[in-house]
């Protein structure tokens, strides 16, 4: 059997996925499979085609490896899942002994540490600890505080902090009220961390403040000092991988090690020294997944040399992946794991295909073709750089799109330029680090030279974002689309590989037959896909139900409406002072909902918690129409809005009471407030919020912005002769359920069946008020609130049948 380790990896991944997503027992499934396999070997069934194909496609030794490895990983993941479920309860008070196992991360109001539990039944469990105290790596503490369970995704396909922490093997956070230092554990990792801090201190002394954060990122994988704008530039230019210590860095360390030790100790001893240096480097850089993968693969290559065996790249990749997944099965869902393995597989297996393609580009002119061929032969390293960039990008493309929702076509240029300077940068940087330990003065002089490629790297990241028509925003792909993408990549790879094989194995013959059959039917397959694509477009044009999504944006309001004819309406967008809701929550949410264009954007008023996210959206995607109420007071946000309108050339409609906004047949908004005849000067921005009523057949929803009691009374007074216009099925409770809003008088007039409250979890304003909740409950109005339920999804049929679901299970 070729490459059994790869088969074991496949089985191991199957076991993890099965344990997490399928309720049926994997043991039961394998029993059925083995019975089928046994039947296929009984003579009277041998001629049956169904069982014949089972026997062909599943060899017993392959099946055995998959079963054993998947059962092991399935047991491990189920044990891990059970451990998460039976740990501590949210809010539980703990008194435990712990050890600090990383350096502090400074937050706005506290310091955060990663800790390992040393006492209690949950020994060796990892947690985050928050405290205002300054503590050090290796300190053993006795702490007392409350346990906080990490939050889950609060919106559709939103960021799941709980699942993210699982990839770090962290179970939650303890807010330490009391901290008592007991001892210091001075193990190997303690001294590795001391070395890391010393290197960081030397870098800060020898590099200027502009280049030092990038040097830290490139050489140590420490990106904590890099500002958000620089991160964004590196990401948009498709070169963010240089800030994560990876195989590229490890290869240069191996190169330096070989050159400096081989002449003195010989090849075999130098390999042992290389392994030691790599493990030290791995400890210094903090055991990131990409470094662990690179070091394991390099160690296997060196070990193969020492025992006179040929090293196999696929086996090395598989062994490293199995080790990393054995350490933590949830690493399978880590972006770092996915990037490092997709990129490595792309470079190792797909690069030769890209190189062949570049070398064999068909040019009609014989003269030009000869010149092109000669150029490729003479500049083979240049062709290789292009092939590396393309192959890595092709394999990581679905991950990039899923995480960042953009495609950059400048990646070839930026990665070629980075490929030229990264070698001198890493080698020069490592030499500078070593020399600085001997002489700070000489180290400072070397740093001046290393700063040249660092400055060039920073310049490339900025230029990469400026290329015209190269960066495209894209919606989040579905899982089935990603599977099809990688299946096509695999077919391309296998067809290329199979052409170069003289003698085929049994499995290769089967796969070749399948690929030939697929290729022979390519026209039919293309037609089928075209029909499916056209059908999906037609289906999207068919009128459906009215859908309203009350998005959880923390302490703020945001509502997305999809009309029966699939128009998109966005009402408010939340916003916080210290967190960019638009960038981090609202825009990704729209991409996850397959939205690249908004038909109507309605801003109730220009308080940060209503317009903050909207202002970002207006700059990022196409918005056809913007609707605002008449403004009676200037504000910073309103001035910013006017600048964006001018820059983006947006179509703005200013409305007030009495206006009707027709969206489509049987669906329109009635504007009920503000009224220029009854302008309120007290807290003008809130009390002159745009109040509008969505009408769809027999269903209605009243949007109230942040109006308070004074405005509510004015509205009731204004429509006392036509009070039915205020009656609504759903009330968007004003001002997040504040005690200054939702007076009994307006509740009696609106008579809602449901009340929605957009409010932040554990907010400092005391929203929603107990008085408001009591007033709603007294009238038997069903309450939905984002702090407890997350996103609220409403589906309304033509007959006004309402179906409401929430993201978080509140039972």
Per-region residue spans from a language model:
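Metallo-beta-lactamase
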Residues: 598-609, 631, 731-735
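N-terminal leader/targeting segments
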Residues: 1-85, 195, 293, 498-504, ...
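Core dinuclear metal-dependent hydrolase active-site scaffold
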Residues: 326, 330-333, 462-600, 646-730, ...
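Active-site HxH/HxHxD metal-binding segment of metal-dependent hydrolases
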Residues: 608-646, 752
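Aromatic-rich juxtamembrane segments at the membrane interface
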Residues: 167-297, 302-303, 378, 394, ...
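Membrane-interface helix/helix-cap signal primarily in integral membrane proteins
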Residues: 69-241, 583-593, 597, 631-633, ...
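Hydrophobic alpha-helical transmembrane segments in multi-pass membrane proteins
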Residues: 3, 7, 15, 45, ...
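Cap/insert and terminal regions of metallo-dependent hydrolase folds
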Residues: 625, 712-790
